[in-house]
From Swiss-Prot:
Source organism: Borreliella burgdorferi (strain ATCC 35210 / DSM 4680 / CIP 102532 / B31)
Top-level taxon in the UniProt lineage: Bacteria
UniProt cross-references to NCBIfam families, sorted A to Z: PRK01130.1
Pfam family, one: NanE
Alphabetical list of Gene3D superfamilies matching this protein: Aldolase class I (3.20.20.70)
EC id: 5.1.3.9
Protein name (Swiss-Prot/TrEMBL): Putative N-acetylmannosamine-6-phosphate 2-epimerase
CDD domains tied to this protein: NanE (cd04729)
Amino acid sequence: MIIIVKIKRGLIVSCQALENEPLHSSFIMSKMALAAKIGGAIGIRANGVNDISQIKLEVDLPIIGIIKKNYNNCDVFITPTMKEIDELCNEGVDIIALDATFRNRPDGVLLDDFFENIKKKYPKQCLMADISSLDEAINADKLGFDFIGTTLYGYTKNTNGLNIADNDFNFLRTLLNSNLKSTLIVEGKIDTPLKAQKCFEMGVDLVVVGGAITRPAEITKKFVEKINQIKK
């Protein structure tokens, strides 16, 4: 698939800011994407058609598009229904990422059926599975997702508090040894250059970094917390 070759090996920067964050602005996210490109990023992950359309005016990098939408207290919120798929396809994104965990979807549709429905309607659209476990990765691989991302590892009830770097990246090592046909993308809690480097050394070709690059409030907070640990 052409898109896989186009974004082969490198850093993808997630440029997102939610409504309650100071940098919530499609214009600001587009400039963040431009800065990421200048810094050497080979792709962008973005949330919402407004941000995506603005980012496309600034950079010509491949875009992983998502729409975060909460439905009736459902845990699944990353591109959860066909409505969000339609919006992203109409906007035009290289890859659509969606929650591919085993959790209940807001419309009651099973992941297998959801994937099949997407492929029937948009057969050429590249899809990325955001997973939180080995079993979910294997299932996504069998379904035929183009990419599998560790995005939700540490962010579900069963994995809460876990970190991709735990036990010398044991979860990542397990995925790499599972003979997945889909291209593996490491995403989630890669908050230092050394962690990203480690992923590539282990054999990963694509790593997504978000908050460590694009959320200055969080970055500032980490500095302040370390400073405040020093007793006067």
